[in-house]
Swiss-Prot record:
One of its GO terms (molecular function) is monosaccharide binding. The keyword Cytoplasm applies. It comes from Methylocella silvestris (strain DSM 15510 / CIP 108128 / LMG 27833 / NCIMB 13906 / BL2). This is Glucose-6-phosphate isomerase. It is an enzyme of class 5 (isomerase). Pathway: Carbohydrate biosynthesis; gluconeogenesis; Carbohydrate degradation; glycolysis; D-glyceraldehyde 3-phosphate and glycerone phosphate from D-glucose: step 2/4. It is found in: Cytoplasm. Keywords: Cytoplasm, Gluconeogenesis, Glycolysis, Isomerase. GO terms for cellular component: cytosol. The gene is pgi. InterPro entries: G6P_Isomerase (IPR001672), G6P_Isomerase_C (IPR023096), Phosphoglucose_isomerase_CS (IPR018189), SIS_dom_sf (IPR046348), SIS_PGI_1 (IPR035476), SIS_PGI_2 (IPR035482). It comes from the Bacteria. GO terms for biological process: gluconeogenesis; glucose 6-phosphate metabolic process; glycolytic process.
Amino acid sequence: MDRSKVANAFAALDAYARRSGAPKIADLFAADPQRFDRFHARFDDLLYDFSKHRLDAETLRLLLDLGRAAEVEPRREALFEGDPVNITERRAALHMALRNLSGAPMRAAGEDVAAMVEAEREKLLAFAEAVRSGAIRAANGARFTDIVNFGIGGSDLGPAMAARALSPFIADHLRLHFVANVDGADFADTMRNTPVETTLFIVCSKTFTTLETMTNAATARAYVAERLGPDAIASHFCAVSTQLDRIAAFGVRSDRVFGFWDWVGGRYSIWSSIGLSLAIGVGRDNFEAFLRGGEDIDRHFREAPLERNIPVLMALIGVLNRNVFGYATQAVIPYDQRLARFPAYLQQLDMESNGKSVDLSGARVAYETSPVVWGEPGTNGQHAFFQLLHQGTEIVPVDFLVAAKPTAADETHHRILFANCLAQSQALMQGRPLEAVSAQLAAQGLSPDAIAALAPHKVFDGDRPSSTFLYTALTPRTLGRLIALYEHKIFVQGVIWDINSFDQWGVELGKELAQKLAPIVGDDSASTEALDASTAGLVQAARARRAGA
């Protein structure tokens, strides 16, 4: 790639978007009654409205020029062709193959992986159906009632998010639980009201060495052995890993082990055997519908022209907000309570992928990369942080997600929810100027002095950008589509920023230091002389508190 072309394209975009006298978003709507028609994109029943951003037709043209200069299209093909796009680990990033229900050839390192992916998926779904039906039972002969998933990062965030999102589709006789934190309270709280005699534990760790996961799994194994006897372990555990020797030593039967491949990154692994807990919960048909939703977007992303390509448009607008306007964070606000964990899922997906400071050549980048991604469901967020969104000194772009139809039966609740979603995006864009506030206060009978004192506090500047994703209802297929949209958006941004979106070396140093600290923390007589003063002081303070000082 010729980075000078990217630099030139960005310079043209930056000069135009930040030109003197650039109109506000509300003025763009006033000048163009057809603005919504021009600045939204559709895929099937999914609508992406990006009209409430600070861009016009020329801005969009320049953004598309930037994408082409960065060679988004050939890089996209390299991704789908299984090229080693994860250059630091010399691997493909072929999670799309996991949702390739068509069986079309997909290659990693020159090997067509479609058949082996299908075989592993079929093994997983057959097991899931057997657990659901009661063909596979607990040691006492009873049907399983509870599924506990041990994992962390992508092995937890994905399944936990999806299980919450698709809760109406989970079998009535099953409850799904997710234990991630090495804090023993996580496991203890989960098991407090969970009957161990009808609980199936799933240990998700590719290497079967992940500290947090294996600590929790070992605790669970001892818990089962103590309450049900050691012979029950084989009936109550299964594993998602590639390390058969370690799994056998742990006590998991070989026919209850499910694998995946090194070209599947953790944050993309929900589509793989890591989704076993979800598959047990929702069943074969719904799990396949979830995969089909991701496959739908893969096809759209690969085939749609850039100007109508939703992940590409999402990425370009994100680059505009991050690199031209300097917005440091991105809020994700689903007006859909069952998507409560979606912001946290996207937080890992985005920040672990693109939270990088060196380019593909190893040189320091001279521009910002991933924003801080955060969010909570609406309307809850309106009573927490929306004050900052509307009147704070930082402008925070927002992604709103909302269904046209409720998954619950009560239409009244959904009408209120939907109205609030639209109202918030409208308020962020339009604002309320001082003149309008003053007129409103005057109509309420306030004196001129009272108006002068109060009005500045009630001004909304507006001109705060947002996108809205509208879909018919939150179904398994819809969820698959939403996840894949963000996956590909993040990939495109990584291409433009010339970074590796598929490694995560930033998680390693803390883990290494924790391994060195663990013996010191566990032995009150261990020396702290080699530690920095702060860490040593904290260790000594903890020792004193444990001793009752």
